[in-house]
């Protein structure tokens, strides 16, 4: 096996799927990954390379002959890893998490081994049927209304990202509205969201042909942790109705990106219902927490929703990508996204006896993503997954208390889940209201490589985000981050004197 570990290689690499070669290489890759995780704290959390660094160290054309695995591992260690920002580091507190786990990793391995393209039931019945079953399991864990189950008119499907989930929901809503009001009414369709809604909705509107001037961005209520005020939505809607426009879609969020705000679902749901609008709920981040009984109330009002999404790949130990979408009536999704060319026709599909997930998504091809979610649920169980969520929320609460113990800092919004929004309080003489002060503090700790934070802007304030959610994070990592922040705060405040 020269091409695997030793010298030349030659014909060894003309067998792309040899079981024994896979066994040897696979063992070595698993060892490499395990060693990476064991030593992950030794790496700077935020990559410290400069743009274009990789072009300087890799050749400008592909090799004519096969290289060795040893050489490849060396290049990964010396050239690739320096350019990796380590999302699985226990000191990663920047964006909402992207969880990995042994179960998720094993599921990805098995999915890669089967390497099916499961666009219809016939292409791999197990892929379709497992997805239906696991999404029903998850809906029951979240206590979603029975209409979202596959046994009713609705059902669940795995999308790549929440952006895709929001897009397909919007397309279904658009086509439902056009069917009711006429195909020439597109220019009158209006979407409602808040200024805290994820930018994915804006992109979805661009793709769906919704006029930019018909996207109502309602300013969130800073007195309600930046949740949207139903009264403001109703007011905007009334103005649009009087102008002859057609309100057709409301997007609410459970756990906004900037502050983890929870929009008032019951009130927004009633607005949507009263005006025959599609009501979508994006719980990409915080949906995972709602498997815990003490956080389930944040989904009260979901019974009025037409669609609901959350990301298992964020905070549910399921490797990226795995975004879960449920709809109350799958026919609207299928009518909007279905295509049926001759080469895809088959007996099972023609008999309408199976689910073809190609008609629930944008692309034709799809991966066997339900495997990893199934393995996460099987190997960890709901009780342990709830404990995992609670641990992160406890660590965020601990960090919040540390902030409150130092008068130099302020917690900008009340903590709801595992995100803490805070800033260094600027001196009264600071005409920038702390923007540069907090940017410099963030840049200082990020440049150290010891932790990674991100920021947002709330009511004009430059605010730092401390998002707990990496699988390896313990209390000692939170304490170390706090010490680093205090030291950096002393440094940047000293420069202002």
UniProtKB/Swiss-Prot annotation:
Keywords: Decarboxylase, Lyase, Pyridoxal phosphate, Serotonin biosynthesis. The modification N6-(pyridoxal phosphate)lysine is found at residue 314. One of its GO terms (molecular function) is carboxy-lyase activity. Its cofactor is pyridoxal 5'-phosphate. GO terms for cellular component: cytoplasm. It is an enzyme of class 4 (lyase). GO terms for biological process: serotonin biosynthetic process from tryptophan. It holds the Pfam family Pyridoxal_deC. Pyridoxal 5'-phosphate binds at residues 162-163, 257, 311. SUPFAM superfamilies: PLP-dependent transferases. It catalyses: L-tryptophan + H(+) = tryptamine + CO2. Its EC number is 4.1.1.-. InterPro entries: Aromatic_deC (IPR010977), PyrdxlP-dep_de-COase (IPR002129), PyrdxlP-dep_Trfase (IPR015424), PyrdxlP-dep_Trfase_major (IPR015421), PyrdxlP-dep_Trfase_small (IPR015422), Pyridoxal-P_BS (IPR021115). Involved in serotonin biosynthesis. Catalyzes the decarboxylation of L-tryptophan to tryptamine, which is converted to serotonin by tryptamine 5-hydroxylase. May play a minor role in serotonin biosynthetis during senescence. Accumulation of serotonin attenuates leaf senescence. Belongs to the group II decarboxylase family. This is Tryptophan decarboxylase 2. It comes from Oryza sativa subsp. japonica (Rice). The lineage of its organism: Eukaryota, Viridiplantae, Streptophyta, Embryophyta, Tracheophyta.
């Amino acid at each position: 096996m020269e091409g695997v570990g030793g010298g030349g290689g030659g014909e060894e690499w003309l067998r792309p799927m040899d079981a024994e070669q896979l066994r040897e290489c696979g063992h070595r890759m698993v060892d490499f990954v395990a060693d990476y995780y064991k030593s992950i704290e030794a790496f700077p959390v935020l990559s410290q390379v400069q743009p274009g660094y990789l072009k300087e160290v890799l050749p400008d054309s592909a090799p004519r002959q096969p290289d060795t695995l040893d050489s490849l591992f060396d290049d990964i260690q010396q050239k690739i890893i320096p350019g990796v920002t380590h999302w699985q580091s226990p000191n990663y507190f920047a964006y909402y998490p992207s969880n990995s786990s042994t179960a998720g990793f094993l599921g990805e391995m098995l999915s890669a081994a089967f390497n099916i393209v499961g666009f219809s039931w016939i292409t791999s019945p197990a892929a379709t049927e497992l997805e239906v079953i696991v999404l029903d399991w998850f809906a029951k864990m979240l206590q979603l209304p029975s209409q979202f189950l596959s046994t009713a008119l609705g059902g669940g499907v795995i999308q790549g990202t929440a952006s895709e989930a929001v897009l397909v929901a919007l397309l279904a809503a658009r086509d439902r509205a056009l069917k009711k009001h006429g195909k020439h009414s597109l220019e009158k369709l209006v979407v409602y969201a808040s200024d805290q809604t994820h930018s994915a909705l804006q992109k979805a509107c661009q793709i769906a042909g919704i006029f930019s001037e018909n996207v109502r961005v309602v300013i969130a209520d800073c007195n309600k942790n930046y949740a949207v005020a139903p009264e403001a939505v109703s007011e905007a809607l009334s103005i649009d109705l009087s102008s002859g426009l057609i309100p057709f879609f409301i997007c609410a969020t459970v756990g906004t990106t900037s502050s983890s705000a929870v929009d008032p679902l019951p009130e927004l749901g009633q607005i949507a219902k009263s005006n025959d609008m599609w009501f979508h709920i994006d719980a990409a981040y915080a949906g995972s927490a709602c498997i815990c009984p003490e956080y389930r109330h944040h989904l009260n009002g979901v019974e009025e929703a037409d669609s609901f999404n959350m990301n298992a790949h964020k905070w549910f130990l399921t490797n990226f990508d795995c975004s879960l979408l449920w709809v109350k009536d799958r026919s609207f999704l299928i009518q909007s996204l279905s295509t049926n060319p001759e080469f895809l026709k088959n007996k099972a599909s023609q008999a309408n006896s199976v689910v073809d997930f190609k008609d629930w998504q944008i692309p034709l091809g799809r991966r066997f993503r339900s495997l990893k979610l199934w393995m996460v649920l099987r190997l960890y169980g709901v009780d342990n997954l709830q404990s995992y969520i609670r641990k992160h929320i406890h660590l965020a609460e601990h960090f919040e208390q540390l902030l409150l113990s130092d008068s130099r800092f302020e917690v900008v919004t009340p903590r709801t889940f595992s995100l803490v929004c805070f800033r260094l309080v600027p001196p009264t003489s600071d005409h920038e209201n702390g923007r540069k002060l907090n940017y410099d503090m963030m840049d200082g700790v990020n440049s150290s490589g010891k932790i990674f934070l991100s920021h947002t802007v709330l009511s004009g304030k430059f605010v730092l985000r401390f998002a707990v959610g990496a699988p390896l994070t313990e209390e000692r990592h939170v304490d170390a981050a706090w010490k680093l922040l205090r030291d950096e705060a002393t440094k940047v405040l000293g420069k202002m004197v």
